[in-house]
Amino acid sequence: MYNLNALIDRLIEISINNNLIEDMDTVYTRNRLLSLFNENSYTPCEEKLTLSFHETLNELINIAIEKKIIENALYSKDIFSSDIMNIFLPTPSLINKEFYKRYAISPKESTDYFYSLSKSSNYIRTDRIAKNINFKAPSKYGTMDITINLSKPEKDPKEIALARNSVKSNYPKCLLCIENEGYEGTVTHPDRANHRMIRLDLNDRTWMLQYSPYLYYNEHCIILSEDHVPMKIDISTFKNLLSFVDKFPHYFTGSNADLPIVGGSILSHEHYQGGNHRFPMNDAKKLFDFSIEGFEDVECEAIKWPISTIRLRGENIDSLVLASDLILKKWRDYSDETLDILAYSNSEMHNTITPMVRKEDGKFVVDLSLRNNRTSKEHPLGIFHPHEEVHHIKKENIGLIEVMGLAVLPGRLLKELEKIKEYLRDEISLDNIEEYHRPWALELKKKFDYLKSSTDLNDFVNKELSNKFVSVLEHCGVFKLNEEGLEGFKRFTNSLNS
């Protein structure tokens, strides 16, 4: 085991290099770290370590376990590592002052500062994110982004039992609330001692900007309401999204829908997501264009995308807000029984929108994906939700990130796809493959046996996985991209002028 003093010196050295602290802070920081380890003396160590940041942090955690300061459990180790890094961080007020000092130079400089801080403090878990499998694969709608999510470690049975038997707390109320800032964490609530948020004013309401601890794309940020209020999509949503992009034109932002099945995993706290990433949907081609009376300064088109989406372009924020609100209100009450679209069932609302905003070539671009959460006997999880035949790949809600063409697929697929590759190479029998994958594996075998002389196996499986994800998205489209669906889409856009 490494010497504690040498590890402390190494972590301080790394943090100075990462601009978390300055040389002047060395003695103070060292003493605060010694206190965490119940030590009250320090002897300089001749041994100079060259460990990486995460290696150093992990070795410090091992010493804490050895000294019985913490348990050898994931939640306990995470809490302790956040306590360590919190020592290196300024208070929220100082971070906000620095952010806005840099914002006066440029919006990008301010987000670069906060993003770097969030990584250097280990709030963004870059070590775990690096485990994800990411690749791009072609599809009939363009190149899709595929991620197999391996970043979130699994809890062991002991921790699961501890969580099940622990006393439930309503503080913080949810994973997003402002009360998470600096929160120690428990077996049931993640560590947040090293968590900081930037205060934003969007349309006379206070919002918080933070980065996601488990990024799915570059600079994946979350913009959350200061108040714990439910998700909603209305005119204020469009005002907020456009206001955010106006303040940070190098970022996109968007919102999950506000209804179950088609919404995200957290409906209880109003929030948006954003970041510095170009998604496959951004490059979707025009399906047809149309106009809306009274909005001559707004370009309107439907795009060729599996989830039915209207794209608006313009320079005037007020016009885009009002045009988006008109489309939302029309869609809320729109029914087309020939396409299984019903706005209400016994007063239960079914129609909503997943909106996204970005700035491109001097204009704001607003994408409005039309969603419906109705269920049926044939599709009890949702008519416009991934159907049963694709559940072996993805059965969870299709939220904002997936709508834009980035698949976030379960970690189990990593081993399961390797088995399928072994089957395609004739190394194992079909019986060795999970039962829910077998129909797909048989289908792939027929294709690959025909193509294998000219096709790389990994590329083939990646492309077929991408095609399966496209099917997931197509199931969610309210206006299918066939003649009947296209006519239905045009009926809806025509109704915007009635």
From Swiss-Prot:
Protein keywords: Carbohydrate metabolism, Cytoplasm, Galactose metabolism, Nucleotidyltransferase, Transferase
Catalytic activity: alpha-D-galactose 1-phosphate + UDP-alpha-D-glucose = alpha-D-glucose 1-phosphate + UDP-alpha-D-galactose
GO CC aspect terms: cytoplasm
Biological process annotations from GO: galactose metabolic process
Similarity field: Belongs to the galactose-1-phosphate uridylyltransferase type 2 family.
Protein EC: 2.7.7.12
Intracellular or extracellular location(s): Cytoplasm
Protein name according to UniProt: Galactose-1-phosphate uridylyltransferase
Keyword Cytoplasm on entry: yes
Known pathway: Carbohydrate metabolism; galactose metabolism
GO molecular function: UDP-glucose:hexose-1-phosphate uridylyltransferase activity
Source organism of the structure: Clostridium perfringens (strain 13 / Type A)
InterPro entries (alphabetical): GalP_uridyl_Trfase_II, GalP_uridyl_Trfase_II_CS, GalP_Utransf_C, GalP_Utransf_N
Matches recorded under NCBIfam families: galT_2, PRK05270.1-2
